[in-house]
Every structure is written in structure tokens, then in C-alpha cells.
């Protein structure tokens, strides 16, 4: 199911352009339009899910697939840790407005390409 006015659903349908880096039958990954790091990719399910708070038990494999795709993209973009654990990346789900979720379609941020500090913002 897709939502008519959801910007990410519009990207899935090809109605809004995006700089895609990965696509399969379950997920789509593309560059964030407001990156916070040299590499900032959003991985979204093609199925409209509002967020973590609305996940159903049948979505468990889909969320696991999103993490697998994130790892593959990190490897492809050269930000995955090497054997000495140099480099690296951060995976983030923002859940709700107070956490910074601005698009209410489940999405996983893959952020890297620079040293990350903690705590974030």
C-alpha cells in the first residue's frame, strides 16, 4: 500500500526524482536531499509504513532487509569498516517528531564518510 501524498511513496512511484543508489522489489535507497555527512543515504521500504511505531510482526523481515541493504551500500560506497575497524558509518531511525522524524514513511539513515562524534545533535 502506498499513500497518495507521501513524498517517499511518490519517489517509489517515480513521480518525484531521487538520486538512487539501490533498488529491489522490497526497498529503495537514495541520497538524502539535506545530507549531514559526505554520505547520507535513506533506505525506505516500498510498502508505506508510517514508522517504527506502526510496524507489524510481518514487517520483521523487511526491517532486517533494510539493515542488510545498508551494509551492502556502505561497502559499495567505501565507508564500511576495514579489518582494523577503520572507517565506519551510523544507522539511524528517527521515531516521532521529537526525534526529528519529518517524513512519516519508515526510513533508515545511512550516514558516513567522516568521523562521527557522540552524542549527536
UniProtKB/Swiss-Prot annotation:
Gene3D superfamilies hit by this protein: HIT-like (3.30.428.10)
Motif placement: Histidine triad motif: 105-109
PROSITE patterns attached to this UniProt entry: HIT_1, HIT_2
Gene Ontology annotations for the cellular component aspect, listed alphabetically: cytoplasm
Leader sequence segment: none
Chain ranges of the HIT domain: 7-121
Pfam families: HIT
GO MF term set: hydrolase activity
Protein name, as recorded: Uncharacterized HIT-like protein aq_141
Lineage, opening ranks: Bacteria, Pseudomonadati, Aquificota, Aquificia, Aquificales
Amino acid at each position: 500500500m502506498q499513500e497518495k501524498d507521501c513524498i517517499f511513496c511518490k519517489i517509489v512511484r517515480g513521480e518525484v526524482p531521487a538520486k538512487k543508489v539501490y533498488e529491489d522489489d522490497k526497498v529503495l535507497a537514495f541520497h538524502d536531499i539535506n545530507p549531514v555527512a559526505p554520505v547520507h543515504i535513506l533506505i525506505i521500504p516500498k510498502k508505506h509504513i508510517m514508522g517504527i511505531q506502526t510496524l507489524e510482526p510481518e514487517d520483521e523481515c523487511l526491517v532486517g532487509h533494510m539493515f542488510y541493504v545498508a551494509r551492502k551500500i556502505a561497502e559499495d560506497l567505501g565507508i564500511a569498516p576495514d579489518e582494523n575497524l577503520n572507517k565506519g558509518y551510523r544507522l539511524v531511525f528517527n521515531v516521532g517528531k521529537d526525534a526529528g522524524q519529518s517524513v512519516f514513511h519508515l526510513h533508515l539513515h545511512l550516514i558516513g564518510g567522516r568521523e562521527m562524534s557522540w552524542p549527536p545533535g
